[in-house]
C-alpha cells in the first residue's frame, strides 16, 4: 500500500517503513506526526483520490532527526553598476520515518 502525502509545499509518494527528508515544520526528534493524504493506493489496483484530501485516511510518521540541507550560494550582480550581493542559505530539514498508512 502506498500514499501520496503533502508536506512543506511538496508531494511525496510513501510506503510503510520509508524514511524521507522533508522540510522542518516543528516537533522534536521522536515525536509522532500525522501527514495529509492526497491519494491512497492499495493492493489490486485500487486507488482513492482526494479532493483535495482523502477522507478518513491517515499517515502516521515519526521524526527521526533534524538536519540541514546543503549550502547554496545566491549571487546578484548588475553589470557596470558596482552592484554585487552574495548570500548563502541552508534549508532546515527533518528525517521522517513512515510508521503506518491507514485508509
Curated annotation (Swiss-Prot):
<dbReference type="GO" id="GO:0005840">
    <property type="term" value="C:ribosome"/>
</dbReference>
<dbReference type="GO" id="GO:1990904">
    <property type="term" value="C:ribonucleoprotein complex"/>
</dbReference>
<keyword id="KW-0699">rRNA-binding</keyword>
<keyword id="KW-0687">Ribonucleoprotein</keyword>
<dbReference type="Pfam" id="PF00829">
    <property type="entry name" value="Ribosomal_L21p"/>
</dbReference>
<dbReference type="InterPro" id="IPR028909">
    <property type="entry name" value="bL21-like"/>
</dbReference>
<dbReference type="GO" id="GO:0006412">
    <property type="term" value="P:translation"/>
</dbReference>
<comment type="subunit">
    <text>Part of the 50S ribosomal subunit. Contacts protein L20.</text>
</comment>
<keyword id="KW-0689">Ribosomal protein</keyword>
<dbReference type="InterPro" id="IPR001787">
    <property type="entry name" value="Ribosomal_bL21"/>
</dbReference>
<comment type="function">
    <text>This protein binds to 23S rRNA in the presence of protein L20.</text>
</comment>
<dbReference type="InterPro" id="IPR036164">
    <property type="entry name" value="bL21-like_sf"/>
</dbReference>
<dbReference type="GO" id="GO:0003735">
    <property type="term" value="F:structural constituent of ribosome"/>
</dbReference>
<protein>
    <recommendedName>
        <fullName>Large ribosomal subunit protein bL21</fullName>
    </recommendedName>
</protein>
<dbReference type="GO" id="GO:0005737">
    <property type="term" value="C:cytoplasm"/>
</dbReference>
<comment type="similarity">
    <text>Belongs to the bacterial ribosomal protein bL21 family.</text>
</comment>
<keyword id="KW-0694">RNA-binding</keyword>
<dbReference type="GO" id="GO:0019843">
    <property type="term" value="F:rRNA binding"/>
</dbReference>
Amino acid at each position: 500500500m502506498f500514499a501520496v502525502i503533502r508536506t512543506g509545499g511538496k508531494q511525496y509518494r510513501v510506503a510503510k517503513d520509508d524514511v524521507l527528508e522533508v522540510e522542518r515544520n516543528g516537533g522534536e526528534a521522536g515525536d509522532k506526526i500525522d501527514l495529509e493524504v492526497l491519494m491512497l493506493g492499495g493492493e489490486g489496483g485500487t486507488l482513492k483520490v482526494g479532493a483535495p484530501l482523502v477522507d478518513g485516511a491517515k499517515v502516521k510518521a515519526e521524526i527521526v532527526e533534524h538536519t540541514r540541507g546543503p549550502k547554496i550560494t545566491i549571487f546578484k550582480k548588475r553589470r557596470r553598476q558596482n552592484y554585487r550581493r552574495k548570500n548563502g542559505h541552508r534549508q532546515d530539514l527533518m528525517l521522517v520515518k513512515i510508521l503506518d498508512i491507514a485508509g
